[in-house]
Design a protein with these regions (language model features):
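NAD(P)-binding Rossmann-fold cofactor-contacting core
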Residues: 3-20
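Conserved acidic residues
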Residues: 7, 41-42, 142
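Phosphate-bearing ligand-interacting subdomains
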Residues: 17-75, 79
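Short, well-ordered coil loops that connect the C-terminus of an alpha-helix to the N-terminus
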Residues: 3, 65-66, 176
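Glycine-rich beta-alpha junction loops
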Residues: 13-14, 49, 168
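Short, conserved loop/helix-junction motifs that constitute active-site signature segments
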Residues: 1-3, 36
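Structural signal for interior beta-strand "rungs" in well-ordered beta-sheet cores
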Residues: 72-182
């Protein structure tokens, strides 16, 4: 968030236990409705992969409907090709390699140390845990989850809502709603 100042933390109303965190005010979600100058703020939805990323997706869509814009977090110690495209509300931790012509759509989380090969597309609301390898020319659907040390062979298509387990190797196209474990 190098060019952004954190103004508030916002949590669902029933989770507000304190008035601030690290000196930054915490506001209940219901107070977002009271913010008039919504273009003055950018939002980042920091929820994890629960329920195949659908909890984060739902909150992202709720806030988007309110008219807010979003920012992404990209760690300074990641390599991202200047020919890659990163969407909004993406969380990209350290030691990533994101090669040329990669498209990472909205609300995608990449934990530490992943490789996304040239010309690959990662669709909305997907989560890569650590040390995942997606080879070149792959197409990854919406709401997928990749376990630690999983890998995908070149030119593979993985449809929506697929769970790739820890250490799994994907060597063929995967249909929607599948689970892949080795």
């Amino acid at each position: 968030f190098k060019n952004n100042k954190i103004s508030y933390f916002c949590v669902d109303d029933n989770y507000v236990k304190e008035s601030n965190f690290e000196g930054i005010p915490i506001i209940p979600y219901s107070e977002l409705l009271n913010i008039k100058l919504r273009n003055d703020y950018k939002v980042f939805v920091a929820l994890s992969y629960k329920n195949m990323n659908k909890v984060r997706e739902a909150k992202y869509k709720q806030i988007k409907k309110l008219g807010f814009t979003f920012t992404s977090f990209i760690h300074k110690n990641s390599y991202i090709s200047d020919k890659a495209t990163i969407g909004e509300n993406c969380f990209i931790l350290e030691n990533q390699t994101i090669q040329r012509n990669v498209i990472i759509k909205n609300n995608v989380f990449l934990w530490s140390g992943n490789h996304v090969g040239h010309n690959s597309i990662i669709d909305d609301n997907t989560y890569l845990s650590s040390h995942v390898v997606i080879s070149g020319d792959c197409k990854i659907g919406k709401n997928c989850f990749f376990g630690v040390n999983s890998s995908v062979k070149d030119s593979i298509t993985i449809k929506n809502e697929v769970l790739i387990g820890m250490g799994a190797s994907v060597t063929k196209n995967i249909t929607e709603g599948s689970v892949v474990i080795n």
